[in-house]
C-alpha cells in the first residue's frame, strides 16, 4: 500500500521532537525525510521558466518548476529527472545520450512520485497546436479549418496509442516503487472553451477551432485520468482550477504562455506562476502541508 503522505510527515515531526528529549539519541531517531522523485515532460520540467538547471541543458529543466516548489515547501528530498519533450517510452529508455531512463531514479524506498506525461506521445500537443495555428493564420481566424482537415485523427491517436502507453508506464512505475504515492497531473488549459476577442494575435487559432483544440486536450486529460485511476495512482485534476488561466489571458493571470508575444522562450507551456499553481494544487490534492 502507498505510504500516506501525512503519516510520513507527521512521523518526521515526531522523530524530531523525540530526538530533542533524548541524550545520546541513535540514528533510529533521525528525522525522516520524504523521498520524492519527479518524472515527466516539459510541463513538469518547467521548460521555459528561468533559471534553467545547468546540470542537464538538453532537458530544459527549470530550477523553479513545480517539483522544486513542492520540495522547498515540504522539505522533501527531491530527485528531479523531468525532461522537456519526454514521451512515455522515456520512462524505460534513454531520451538523449547520457540521460538515463526516468524510471531509473525510482526505488522501492521512494515515498512520492509526481509526473505529467502523454502530451508528447504521437507529438499530440505540438502537432495539434502547429496544425491549428497554421490553419488559423491562413483562414484569417474564421471557420474551423483545422477541425475540417484533421477531424478525429488526434483523438484517435490519443485513444489507440497514448492511453495504453500511459497505463503501461504507470504499471511499471508502481512495480518499481510499490510503497510510493504516485500523483499524475492533468495538463492545465491551453485555450479557453470558446474564442475570445483579442486572443487571435497571441494564439492564432480560428474561432471554430478553439473548442476543437480544447476538446483534444479534454480527451488527453481524460485518458491520463483513466490510466491513473486504473493503476491505483492519484489523478490531480486541473480542469476547474486552471479555467480562466489559459494562454489567452493577460500576464499575471495566465498560467500558460501563448504561441506569440509571450514572456517565455518556450511558448504554450506553463510560466512561473503556472508552475507555482501546479505545485500548490498538487500539494492540496495530496494533503501535503
Model segments located where?
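Charged, often glycine-rich, active-site loop that binds/positions anionic groups
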Residues: 86-103, 248-262
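Short amphipathic alpha-helices and their capping/turn segments at secondary-structure boundaries
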Residues: 24-37, 95-114, 167-181, 283
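Structural recognition of the beta-strand scaffold that forms the well-ordered cores
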Residues: 35-40, 44, 77-82, 111-116, ...
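Serine-esterase "nucleophile elbow" of acetyl-processing enzymes
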Residues: 31-84, 103-104, 132-139
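Secretory targeting and sorting signals
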Residues: 1-30
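Oxyanion-hole/transition-state-stabilizing segment in secreted/luminal serine hydrolases
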Residues: 47, 96-158, 189
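Catalytic His-Asp segment of secreted/periplasmic serine-dependent ester chemistry enzymes
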Residues: 188-289
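Conserved N-terminal glycine/acidic-rich loop preference
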Residues: 112-115, 138-174, 183, 187-235
Amino acid at each position: 500500500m502507498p505510504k500516506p503522505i501525512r503519516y510520513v510527515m507527521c512521523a518526521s515531526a515526531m522523530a524530531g521532537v523525540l530526538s530533542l528529549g533524548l541524550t545520546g539519541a541513535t540514528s533510529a531517531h533521525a528525522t525522516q525525510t520524504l523521498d520524492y522523485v519527479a518524472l515527466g515532460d516539459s510541463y513538469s520540467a518547467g521548460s521555459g521558466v528561468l533559471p534553467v538547471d545547468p546540470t542537464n541543458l538538453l532537458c530544459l529543466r527549470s530550477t523553479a518548476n513545480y517539483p522544486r516548489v513542492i520540495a522547498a515547501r515540504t522539505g522533501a528530498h527531491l530527485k528531479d529527472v523531468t525532461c522537456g519533450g519526454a514521451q512515455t517510452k522515456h520512462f524505460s529508455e534513454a531520451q538523449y545520450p547520457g540521460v538515463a531512463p526516468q524510471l531509473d531514479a525510482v526505488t522501492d524506498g521512494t515515498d512520492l512520485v509526481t509526473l505529467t506525461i502523454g502530451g508528447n506521445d504521437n507529438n499530440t500537443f505540438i502537432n495539434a497546436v502547429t496544425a491549428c495555428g497554421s490553419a488559423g493564420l491562413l483562414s484569417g481566424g474564421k471557420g474551423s479549418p483545422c477541425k475540417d482537415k484533421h477531424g478525429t485523427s488526434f483523438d484517435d491517436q490519443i485513444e489507440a496509442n497514448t492511453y495504453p502507453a500511459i497505463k503501461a508506464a504507470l504499471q511499471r512505475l508502481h512495480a518499481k516503487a510499490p510503497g510510493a504515492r504516485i500523483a499524475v497531473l492533468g495538463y492545465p488549459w491551453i485555450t479557453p472553451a470558446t474564442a475570445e476577442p483579442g486572443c487571435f494575435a497571441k494564439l492564432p487559432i480560428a474561432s471554430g477551432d478553439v473548442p476543437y483544440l480544447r476538446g483534444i486536450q479534454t480527451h488527453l486529460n481524460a485518458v491520463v485520468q483513466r490510466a491513473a485511476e486504473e493503476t491505483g495512482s492519484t489523478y490531480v485534476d486541473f480542469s476547474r482550477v486552471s479555467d480562466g488561466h489559459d494562454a489567452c489571458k493577460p500576464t499575471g493571470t495566465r498560467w500558460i504562455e501563448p504561441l506569440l508575444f509571450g514572456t517565455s522562450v518556450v511558448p504554450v507551456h506553463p510560466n512561473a506562476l503556472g508552475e507555482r499553481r501546479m505545485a500548490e494544487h498538487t500539494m492540496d490534492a495530496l494533503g501535503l502541508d
